[in-house]
Amino acid sequence: MNLYEIMLEHFAPKGSERGIFTYLLAQSDEEVYEWLKTDPSLSDGRAVYTPYQDNEANGKTYAIYNQSFDIVGHEKYKDRMIRLKGELNDEVELTDLYYGMTLVGWSMVKSDIPSEQIELLKDTGISIESA
């Protein structure tokens, strides 16, 4: 099992905020994506909402560029988000921020984390979800 941190960055007209939203135990980046796609409710009562399900359903493909900005292939939305580890790491243009926009991303904190360490983290009050 791997430990991931789920990060949010919110942009709004009067300011922005970035931080770790929760931690997640999952086997892979794809499992993290699938968990986020469900707009999960967390054990502390909060929820994470993403556009993943809607964007995946529209079937659009995205160009993949190399270092010279030549198109070297295409990928579906799901594959793009898994490769980038969320829209937070995408070079997205932020427009129409009247109501604000929240971007979600993730990174692996530790791979093959022992269950003893997981229990220790939970005992110290750190919120850890499971995919």
From Swiss-Prot:
<protein>
    <recommendedName>
        <fullName>SPbeta prophage-derived uncharacterized protein YoqY</fullName>
    </recommendedName>
</protein>
